[in-house]
Structures are given as C-alpha cells and as structure tokens.
C-alpha cells in the first residue's frame, strides 16, 4: 500500500496524547495558539520532539510559510501534522471536522478524531442518500411522469404519510425515503453529504437521533396541521441538519470558520427549498398535494436537539439551561401534535 495511505488505522493513544502534549508545551502563553514564527523556530530546534524526519521537517516549514503568519491552533496543528506525516485519511477527517466544529471545542473533538477507529464508519447519511435516490428513480420510472419539479408523488406507496394510515406507525419515519421533484432530491442529498457527513464524523450516533427526530417532528406536525394532504420527502431530516448547523454557527459565531459567509448562504439555500415546498402545496397544477410542514418540523427539531445532544466537552450554564428548556419544549411539541392528531377522532 502507498506510504501516504499507511495511516488507515487510528493514531495510537501514545502518539495522540503526544500531539496534545507537544502543542501545550509550545503554547507558552496558554491561549490555544502558537505563532507561526515561534513554531518555525521550535520545529528546527526540537525536530525529535515532533517525530519528524528531514523530509517531514521541510514540509512543515513550507506549510507554515504558506500560512503567512496566521497563528496555529490545535486543529491546525493536527491537520498540519497529518499532512506532514502522510496520514492522508486523518487529514481528510480533520478537514471535514473543521467545517462544523467551533474553535472552542476543537481540542476535545480533534483529540477524539485521532483515536477514531471508523467503527461505525460515517456512512449512514451516504447510504441513506443512495437509498433515497434509488426510490426516486424507481417512482420516476414507475409513474411514467418523468423528471420534473412537482412529481412524481407515489400516493399508494406503503412508505408515505397519510391520515388514512395512522395505525401504520412506521410511515412516520419511512416517508423520508421518498422525494418529490428533482430539486428536492438534489437539495436533500447535498445537505446530507455536505453538512450531515461532517456532523456524523464529529458527533457519530447523535446525528442518527437528530435526523430521525427531525423526521418524526415533521410527520406529526404535518398530521396535526395539514392532515388532508400527503407527506413525503427527506426535507424534515435535512432541515434538522441544516437548522442544527445554523444554530451552532449562531451560538458560536466568532468561533466558526467563515461564519459571515456560511450563515446567509445556508439560510438562502434552505429558504429556496421551502419556497418550492409552499408552491407545491398550494400552486402546483395537480390534485394530490404534499404538505410543507415537514420542513418546519425538521427545523424545530434541529434547533431543540442541538442543545439536547451537542453540549460540548465543558458545558456552560447557558448550555445546561438550554438543554432543559429544549427538552421540555420537545415534550410539549410532541404532546400538542399528538393531541391535535387525535382530536378529530375523539370528537366524533
């Protein structure tokens, strides 16, 4: 195997802890940063401490020069060490984690990533995207409608949410496998891969809960407020991911990479998908309609479960209070939706 791919296994615990020790040893003012000039001098004077050979030393010097004086935090340090040592897989993991992790949480996250054994591997959202695409293509062929913005809508599918199949509880989750329209399937897959996979890499099993709570909140909100139409599509799950990421950016604005650009782009991108959902609900030239409330349910779940699931390694008072408030609000949301769903049958 190519030497650059030799690090398919995780960095061992000794090497992982040594990276933290090295960084802290040379972070003399304990501000979480090492100045580039200082690090250049350090690696020349203490090459053995870094475990570098001559070639790796040259690469690190070049990478530091390319930073043009920008200080090195622990995330940058791990990324540069991986590049210099040819740990290609580790380099990709760190690069993905940089996009979704606030700077004040990176020491904990990157320390965990160094020991990450890819068990389970971060393929849940990749696999889900493949399944969604397969179902979309199947129903496109089966319906003979072709590829367009507002269809097909497989109303007879055993996966779709409908008020006529309330006892079939699996539909509250399986509807996310069916997508209506080419724009929706592209939007959902892009969000799941671009945002969801890095989040899954950092947060692992918590992302499964976040996604499916978004799906559940979307289905019960739709049945509560718009029961006369169908619900299908992965938008609730995708909106839970995008809402969670937007919440993280908003609450850690100064700590996120490119937050000023990323936040408005995400909001506009999500708004376009929701505008299309509103069009399909009220203005599309077809009899069978699809609810737009799945998006809103996913949005609510994404915001609330960000505080429930992602509290960081050192929870602050703000996150502790937010955790309990979000937990209570989630309970109220579910209770109110179930009451509204059950009310018509109870009144008759």
Curated annotation (Swiss-Prot):
Database matches in PROSITE patterns: EF_HAND_1 (PS00018), EF_HAND_2 (PS50222)
Superkingdom field: Eukaryota
GO molecular function: calcium ion binding; serine-type endopeptidase activity
Domain EF-hand: start-end pairs: 14-49
InterPro entries: EF-hand-dom_pair, EF_Hand_1_Ca_BS, EF_hand_dom, Peptidase_S54_rhomboid_dom, Peptidase_S54_rhomboid_met, Rhomboid-like_sf, Rhomboid_IM_Serine_Proteases
Acetylation as UniProt keyword: no
Cellular localization per UniProt: Membrane
Cross-referenced Pfam families: Rhomboid
The keyword Calcium is assigned to this record: yes
Membrane topology: Multi-pass membrane protein
Keywords: Calcium, Membrane, Metal-binding, Transmembrane, Transmembrane helix
GO cellular component, one term: membrane
Binding residues for Ca(2+): 27, 29, 31, 38
Gene null: resulting phenotype: RNAi-mediated knockdown does not affect vulva development. Does not suppress ectopic vulva formation in a let-60 (n1046) gain-of-function mutant background.
Residue intervals passing through the bilayer: 121-141, 177-197, 207-227, 229-249, 263-283, 290-310, 323-343
Cited PANTHER family: INACTIVE RHOMBOID-RELATED PROTEIN 2, RHOMBOID-RELATED PROTEIN
Membership in a protein family: Belongs to the peptidase S54 family.
Function summary: Probable inactive serine protease.
Protein name according to UniProt: Inactive rhomboid-related protein 2
Organism of origin: Caenorhabditis elegans
């Amino acid at each position: 195997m190519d030497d650059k791919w030799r690090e398919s296994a995780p960095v061992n615990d000794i090497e992982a802890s040594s990276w933290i020790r090295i960084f802290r040893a040379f972070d003399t003012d304990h501000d979480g940063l090492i100045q580039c000039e200082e690090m250049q001098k350090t690696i020349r004077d203490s090459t053995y401490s870094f475990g570098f050979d001559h070639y790796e030393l040259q690469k690190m010097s070049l990478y530091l020069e390319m930073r043009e004086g920008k200080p090195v935090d622990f995330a940058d340090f791990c990324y540069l060490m991986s590049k210099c040592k040819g740990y290609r897989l580790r380099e990709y993991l760190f690069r993905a984690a940089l996009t979704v992790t606030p700077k004040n949480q990176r020491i904990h996250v990157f320390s965990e990533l160094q020991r990450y054994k890819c068990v389970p591997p971060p393929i849940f959202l990749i696999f889900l995207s493949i399944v969604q695409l397969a179902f979309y293509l199947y129903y496109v062929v089966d319906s003979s409608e072709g590829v367009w913005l507002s269809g097909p809508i497989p109303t007879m599918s055993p996966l779709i949410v409908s008020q006529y199949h309330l006892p079939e509880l699996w539909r509250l989750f399986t509807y996310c496998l069916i997508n209506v329209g080419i724009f929706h399937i592209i939007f959902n897959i892009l969000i799941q891969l671009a945002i969801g996979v890095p989040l899954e890499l950092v947060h692992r099993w918590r992302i499964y809960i976040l996604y499916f709570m978004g799906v559940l909140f979307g289905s019960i909100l739709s049945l509560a407020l718009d029961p006369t139409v169908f619900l299908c599509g992965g938008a609730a799950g995708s909106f839970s991911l995008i809402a969670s990421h937007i919440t993280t950016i908003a609450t850690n604005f100064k700590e996120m990479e490119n937050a000023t650009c990323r936040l408005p782009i995400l909001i506009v991108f999500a708004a376009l998908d929701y505008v299309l959902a509103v069009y399909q609900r009220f203005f599309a030239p077809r009899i069978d309609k699809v609810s737009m409330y799945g998006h809103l349910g996913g949005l609510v779940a994404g915001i609330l479960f960000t505080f429930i699931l992602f509290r960081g390694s050192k929870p602050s008072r703000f996150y502790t209070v937010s955790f309990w408030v979000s937990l209570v609000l989630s309970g109220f949301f579910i209770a109110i939706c179930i009451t509204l769903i059950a009310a018509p049958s109870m009144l008759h």
